[in-house]
């Protein structure tokens, strides 16, 4: 069996009270049954069950939260009371494992038993400490490989597609010729063509086509000829921003990050248009290209984040679902770029923080995003033209 880890996996350490966006606030913290049993069996920790709530017989219990959506066991210094009083060994799996991720690549053997071919270990970029580690890497994401596969192993089709996406995003080999947004678009184009394939052999043929530099150049020439109007691009970006943040902008955890930007979008596109709103939009149109150039200074970080998230999340055995995950990962990039534009703060700390924010909002809610696309576009797989518009 082969084990693959992202370069920084073993180096991760929680920064606890120094974290600018704690993982103890803003989402549900599931408490696994083994932890519940462990707490209840020890008279010193039995009281911890009072800080949990049941959501139903067939689902794990959750930690109770306060009005700010923070875990009740988070103290005023940003430290966990469970760890302070009882040690790391009494954390529930959710808290002990985050932001670590583990995936297994499997196949069925001759008697239809599942056999593990590869175990992959990675870190979620929703954690600001992980984001800092990604920023500190000198080049690509970096994968540490141990072990060997048996001869004759046939890796799943979706796994081969995912690995091609990672190579694309990181600008490896022939993909180095293209900009980050071009590589993102080529990846989406590849997925669309794979979805149209009838057989696995056709998918392999498609992967070969996307290893041909002349074919890639032709595809980018096609997209560049579209030249979407800045008015259309800005309107769709603002609409997307508004839709994604509508729920979160009023939540205590997320309001400080997205409320002001959402208000700016509202002022650009009021229910009844005004001359003042039109003037603000015109100013935005005029500075968009300059913004993209400034944000591109963080392309090396962005490509590592994208590659890391693709490595972690695009592991479905269904190409359609894999494409939905890819869309969500790219939307994290689009939303971060748009937020920085709206706020006008291009500091490294701000870019990292907003990237972590949108990995939480979007990446950890991929199923919800698929439902959103289905509801608004009548298909959870976006059209390529619309995808290109958002990247423009």
Which residues make up each language-model segment?
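N-terminal cysteine/histidine-rich coordination modules
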Residues: 1-78, 82-92, 97-143
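Short, charged N-terminal helix-start/capping segments
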Residues: 2-19, 161, 246-265
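Short, exposed beta-strand "edge-strand" segments with a Pro/Gly-rich flavor and a Y/T-containing core
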Residues: 24-31, 170-178, 197, 341-346
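Alpha-helical structural motif
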Residues: 31-35, 123, 157, 161, ...
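Residues that form generic nucleotide/phosphate-binding pockets
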Residues: 38, 42, 164, 168-171, ...
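Conserved aromatic-histidine-acidic binding/catalytic patches
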Residues: 83-87, 115, 153, 320-328
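Charged, amphipathic alpha-helical linkers/stalks
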Residues: 125-220
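Hydrophobic, aromatic-lined core segments that form the binding pocket/scaffold
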Residues: 180-392
């Amino acid at each position: 069996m082969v084990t693959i880890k992202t370069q920084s996996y073993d180096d991760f350490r929680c920064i606890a009270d120094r974290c600018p966006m704690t993982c103890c606030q803003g989402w549900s913290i599931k408490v696994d049954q083994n932890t519940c049993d462990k707490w209840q069996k020890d008279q010193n920790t039995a009281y911890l069950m009072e800080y949990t709530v049941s959501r139903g017989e067939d689902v794990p219990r959750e930690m109770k939260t306060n009005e700010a959506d923070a875990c009740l066991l988070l103290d005023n210094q940003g430290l966990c009371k469970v760890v302070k009083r009882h040690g790391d060994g009494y954390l529930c799996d959710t808290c002990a494992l985050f932001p670590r991720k583990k995936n297994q690549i499997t196949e069925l053997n001759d008697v239809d038993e599942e056999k593990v071919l590869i175990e992959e270990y990675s870190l979620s970029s929703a954690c600001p400490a992980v984001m800092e580690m990604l920023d500190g890497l000198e080049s690509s994401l970096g994968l540490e490989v141990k072990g060997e596969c048996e001869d004759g192993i046939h890796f799943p089709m979706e796994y081969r597609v995912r690995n091609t996406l990672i190579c694309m995003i990181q600008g490896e080999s022939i993909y180095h010729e293209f900009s980050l947004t071009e590589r993102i678009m080529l990846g989406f184009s590849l997925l669309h063509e794979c979805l149209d394939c009838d057989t696995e052999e056709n998918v392999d043929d498609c992967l070969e086509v996307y290893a041909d530099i002349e074919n890639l150049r032709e595809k980018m020439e096609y997209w560049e000829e579209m030249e979407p109007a800045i008015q259309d691009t800005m309107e769709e970006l603002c609409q997307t921003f508004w839709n994604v943040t509508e729920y979160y902008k009023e939540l205590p955890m997320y309001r400080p990050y997205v409320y002001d930007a959402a208000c700016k979008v509202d002022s650009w596109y009021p229910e009844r248009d005004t001359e003042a709103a039109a003037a603000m939009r015109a100013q935005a149109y005029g500075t968009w290209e300059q913004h993209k150039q400034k944000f591109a200074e963080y392309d090396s970080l962005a490509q590592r984040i994208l590659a890391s998230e693709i490595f972690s999340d695009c592991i479905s055995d269904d190409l359609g679902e894999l494409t939905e995950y890819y869309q969500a990962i790219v939307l994290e990039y689009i939303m971060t770029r748009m937020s920085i534009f709206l706020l006008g703060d291009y500091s490294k700390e701000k870019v990292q923080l907003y990237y972590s924010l949108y990995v939480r909002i979007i990446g950890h809610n991929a199923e919800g995003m698929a439902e959103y696309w289905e509801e608004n576009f009548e298909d959870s797989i976006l059209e390529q033209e619309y995808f290109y518009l958002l990247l423009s």
